[in-house]
Regions:
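C-terminal edge-of-domain segments
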Residues: 59-86
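Surface-exposed beta-strand edges and their flanking turn/coil or helix-capping segments
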Residues: 21-24, 53-55, 80-82
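Short, hydrophobic/π-rich interface segment
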Residues: 27-69
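Generic structural motif recognizing short loop/turn segments at the entrances and edges of beta-strands
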Residues: 1-7, 36-37, 63-65, 76-78
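An N-terminal amphipathic alpha-helical segment
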Residues: 1-34
Length: 86
């Protein structure tokens, strides 16, 4: 995707399935074009994505991405912004 975008992984099947959150976050980053970012919105049930998702993304993508924790949403979920470098 050659634009900045967001994906919501915070409701329904994601709330109790951390593996699904990680798998779909990896897929979202893969679909993001070089030079753009995806805001990955994660469930409140798993807490701050820096504690579980950031490590998984770094293990998969290495230096091809940069990440920044943005904030906790008013709805309770969390936003992790992931930039695709190449």
């Amino acid at each position: 995707m050659d634009k900045n975008w967001s994906i919501s992984l915070e409701h329904e099947e994601y709330v109790m399935d951390m593996e699904l959150v990680i798998t779909d976050a990896i897929d979202a980053v893969e679909k993001t074009g070089k030079g753009y970012y995806v805001n990955v919105v994660t469930p409140a049930s798993f807490g701050n994505p820096n504690d579980y998702l950031a490590d998984a993304l770094l293990a998969y993508f290495g230096g091809r991405i940069e990440m920044k924790f943005i904030d906790q949403c008013g709805c309770g979920g969390y936003v992790l912004r992931v930039w695709k470098n190449n």
